[in-house]
Amino acid sequence: MTKTKIIFMGTPQFAATVLKGLIDSNKYEILAVVTQPDRKVGRKQELRMTPVKELALTVNLPVLQPEKLSGSVEMTQIMTLLESGEVGIVTAAFGQFLPGKLLVVARFAVNTHASLLPKYRGGAPIHYAIMNGEKEAGVTIMEMIRKMDAGDMIAQNSTPILEEDNVGTMFEKLAFVGRDLLLETLPKYLEGQLKAQAQNEDEVTFSPNISPEEEKIDWNKSAREIFNKVRGMNPFPVAHTLWNGERFKIYESKVADEIVNNSDNPLQAGQIVEKTKKSLKVATGNGILELLTVQPAGKPKMDIVSFLNGLGQKMQVGDKLGD
């Protein structure tokens, strides 16, 4: 059997799961793997490889790591590979725009995008799906064009978003959904058995990369909205507020009460309204939010009981979180 020649482009664990599927299928000859450069992470600023690079090195695949594709040495290498014959491009959460000339030369170019397009085009589709309270998310296999995530759709599959899900759990679920969908549909697409369908431009929504401002909790929002924001940013980039003028990260929470604050119940948004040895509750613009896992400035992440037994002893009912 002649293997389909491809160049794979991807960066996080989501992409590594897709790449592993392509490798294990034994249907593809992967000429090169393109991923983001190694980055310094954590307090110690240790240089870390991307999950895609780690996987590629274990199976001796050539790895290219351009800071930016356009005008790079790696771009020239990729063009040489594409011009050598019938070579396609497969991407999954790569994190860079592909120059148009790559799309022209490639035999085909398909992307594994973690949303139910045309909803949530952009770099943070899973985050926004959860933050917006969606009940399901999914993956779309799509043709790549010069416009971001706007190509025709080859296939799509969905999975529920549960109350206990966060960005981390959904990334993991959708990685396997994407892997299986790509492996199932790519051969059929290349054989002409599947015809790509245009996206409905009237239904397009966007999910741009999360800005630092977006990470801040607005306590005037409802408890339900803040709950969705917290899980829509866990484990990264993590929603935060201020306590005593310092950053206070919130990883997990739950809606304790969705009552409407009114004149008979004049709670101030961001105010601590209940504190016991095991729980901490905060008023919002509409309802009460219970904090479950937090990280005070300069401290490790901890469950709320550990916080209340330590630094949290200084926190009192009536204190206010936020600006």
Curated annotation (Swiss-Prot):
What is its EC class?
Answer: transferase
Q: Which amino acid positions bind (6S)-5,6,7,8-tetrahydrofolate, per UniProt?
A: 115-118
SUPFAM superfamilies linked: FMT C-terminal domain-like (SSF50486), Formyltransferase (SSF53328)
Sorted keywords for this record are:
Protein biosynthesis, Transferase
InterPro entries linked: Fmt (IPR005794), Formyl_trans_C (IPR005793), Formyl_trans_C_sf (IPR037022), Formyl_transf_N (IPR002376), Formyl_transf_N_sf (IPR036477), Formyl_transferase-like_C_sf (IPR011034), Met-tRNA-FMT_C (IPR044135), Met-tRNA-FMT_N (IPR041711)
Q: CDD domains of this UniProt entry?
A: FMT_core_Met-tRNA-FMT_N, Met_tRNA_FMT_C
Substrates-to-products reaction catalysed: L-methionyl-tRNA(fMet) + (6R)-10-formyltetrahydrofolate = N-formyl-L-methionyl-tRNA(fMet) + (6S)-5,6,7,8-tetrahydrofolate + H(+)
GO cellular component entries? cytosol
Domain of life of the source: Bacteria
A molecular function (GO) term: methionyl-tRNA formyltransferase activity
Write the Enzyme Commission number(s) for this entry: 2.1.2.9
Function of this protein?
A: Attaches a formyl group to the free amino group of methionyl-tRNA(fMet). The formyl group appears to play a dual role in the initiator identity of N-formylmethionyl-tRNA by promoting its recognition by IF2 and preventing the misappropriation of this tRNA by the elongation apparatus.
Q: Which family does it belong to?
A: Belongs to the Fmt family.
What NCBIfam families does this protein map onto? fmt (TIGR00460)
Full protein name:
Methionyl-tRNA formyltransferase
Q: Which organism is it from?
A: Lactococcus lactis subsp. cremoris (strain MG1363)
